[in-house]
Amino acid sequence: MERIKELRDLMSQSRTREILTKTTVDHMAIIKKYTSGRQEKNPALRMKWMMAMKYPITADKRIMEMIPERNEQGQTLWSKTNDAGSDRVMVSPLAVTWWNRNGPTTSTVHYPKVYKTYFEKVERLKHGTFGPVHFRNQVKIRRRVDINPGHADLSAKEAQDVIMEVVFPNEVGARILTSESQLTITREKKEELQDCKIAPLMVAYMLERELVRKTRFLPVAGGTSSVYIEVLHLTQGTCWEQMYTPGGEVRNDDVDQSLIIAARNIVRRATVSADPLASLLEMCHSTQIGGVRMVDILRQNPTEEQAVDICKAAMGLRISSSFSFGGFTFKRTSGSSIKKEEEVLTGNLQTLKIRVHEGYEEFTMVGRRATAILRKSTKRLVQLIVSGRDEQSIAEAIIVAMVFSQEDCMIKAVRGDLNFVNRANQRLNPMHQLLRHFQKDAKVLFQNWGIEPIDNVMGMIGILPDMTPSTEMSLRGVRVSKMGVDEYSSTERVVVSIDRFLRVRDQRGNILLSPEEVSETQGTEKLTITYSSSMMWEINGPESVLVNTYQWIIRNWEAVKIQWSQDPTMLYNKMEFEPFQSLVPKAARGQYSGFVRTLFQQMRDVLGTFDTVQIIKLLPFAAAPPEQSRMQFSSLTVNVRGSGMRILVRGNSPVFNYNKATKRLTVLGKDAGALTEDPDEGTAGVESAVLRGFLILGKEDKRYGPALSINELSNLAKGEKANVLIGQGDVVLVMKRKRDSSILTDSQTATKRIRMAIN
């Protein structure tokens, strides 16, 4: 106050005002401040002052030949005076206008290609819809977000190689383009940018925007996909938000979204198989998302989600060191603990073995709809500060924190038995048992927790056991805050290990992730996910299992028919027939299997009764463990479309229909593929298959002994000849090939040669 009074007094004297307004600025310190260094100290002022001059711009001397001295209005465009300190000319802003209107034009064909990301952004904004503005408190939390819509997911190094190859192909330097995406992008861009006149540096800069994911750690209250982040400044302020729907989607957001869905489906499916880890890897390697191999996406995509991280861990990739519990990401910010096995009694006197964390620790908890700071000591919640979008979200966070605290009153609040199981019908571990129990109903937990009076702290209020806010009382140690808790910002990745039950541990042995943490939320993927693995056939229901099983047999028919005749047991045990078993009524599985296997054996024994279509049709039924019974069936039942449908043993049905004219098979009305060979040739099919590896020499030759059956052929040595009985009792002479390489042609030539030999 004193200083201000003093200044007021000074200003009231006219001499002071005169000194301040009229004196020249020639004080050395001031001159130094504004003239030292290349950095402009007051750019706005400099700009205004420059533009007030007649010739504020300098240009290359060549401009004098390219621009007239005066424009149509007779205004001077450039001055004959040289720019002090360089050999450039001084130019008027009017020259720029003249150049824009009358200057040389060039082809614009490359602009949309080079500035693709900008053109696409304009389109998205043009078609986007902005809704009303709402004024309300914004709970923003900093999250790592993608700020660059429409990019591929190359690493900085991969992108650098692509850019060098496209923009500076003749520069020296080793460039290794290895990944599929690198090669494709390089090829496309080279084509697009032929004869491009845009400055190479600009092209390189724009290519980088297209190829590399750029992330920033920004405060966000709403959507986090890149098409929302690009308009963050328009959609959320400190106390307002504006509704916005993007006018288009970009592939990178779609990849992230589809990757999460694929990973969740795969982890859920792997959990119920005999060897979860092996199954998970098999599925990751055989799945494509939007036409790109899932394993390639996993290697490049930094998305952090429980299922995605489990898949990454299985592939030996590093993942974030934070751990997951109850759908929240926990990051320890201070403290430490040791784990001790302990037996505790629930309120129902059930004994639980839990690993108790002994020691004081602090964590941040970040979920989709709520965040919190948790301070705990051994079996004690010290403090929980939680913020969330609504009552429900806040309650979810409180339950997870209370269970995680391992407090006795939480364990005693259990009513009834804990027997939750996972998808594979295995009991969950005790901590997840407790979590599931209270997620179903937390009333007793909240009632038994205890409440305490609270102090009035800015931005904090209390919350009562019925989840209503209060300024007087609160659940013991729990407060609700207006401020969110930031996500963990570090992008550090750590080496982890994974066991066959898909539990992911850090190097100290702490569990970071397990299948229990994978969300059950179902979504519809934006990009097509193609699961080639038979384990994923059931994801689209029984019909898809049926169609896929038959498609698989037809695609692999050449190999299948050889196995059918030479090693049926191995064929019946193929995992591709596993999903099909769930369609066959439980009571009938063994009987159907026994019946079909007997039928197949008769076909092998009695030559000439071979029927390709029938084998394909009945094969999946033979995969179940067979029951020995003399039962005969004319039709077999499968459970699809909510009821039992019949497959006729002889003849077509709506489920399995083979069209002789087109040689195509339809299953439930869906095309399941074409049979490449002609099933009407009776035995030719299996014989040409079985005679692979044999050369047909001609008619029977008595010198080589009695005719063998097809099954006995496998005992011949290479180069050995024998008579063999085929088809309708005809006998031909064959020789076992010395080389395996020509086997492929055998089955085609065999059919022709058999006919010649017989006729």
Curated annotation (Swiss-Prot):
- Mention any one GO cellular component term assigned to this protein in its UniProt record: host cell nucleus
Instruction: List S-S links within the chain.
Output: none
Q: Does the keyword Protein biosynthesis apply?
A: no
Organism classification: Viruses, Riboviria, Orthornavirae, Negarnaviricota, Polyploviricotina
Q: Where is this site: Avian adaptation?
A: 627
Q: Which organism is it from?
A: Influenza A virus (strain A/Chicken/Victoria/1/1985 H7N7)
Q: Where is the motif Nuclear localization signal annotated in this sequence?
A: 736-739
Intracellular or extracellular location(s)? Virion; Host nucleus
Instruction: Give one GO term, molecular function aspect.
Output: RNA binding
Q: How does it assemble?
A: Influenza RNA polymerase is composed of three subunits: PB1, PB2 and PA. Interacts (via N-terminus) with PB1 (via C-terminus). Interacts with nucleoprotein NP (via N-terminus).
This one is known as: Polymerase basic protein 2
GO process annotations (BP): 7-methylguanosine mRNA capping; cap snatching; DNA-templated transcription; symbiont-mediated suppression of host gene expression; symbiont-mediated suppression of host mRNA transcription via inhibition of RNA polymerase II activity; viral RNA genome replication
Keywords, alphabetical? Cap snatching, Eukaryotic host gene expression shutoff by virus, Eukaryotic host transcription shutoff by virus, Host gene expression shutoff by virus, Host nucleus, Host-virus interaction, Inhibition of host RNA polymerase II by virus, mRNA capping, mRNA processing, Viral transcription, Virion
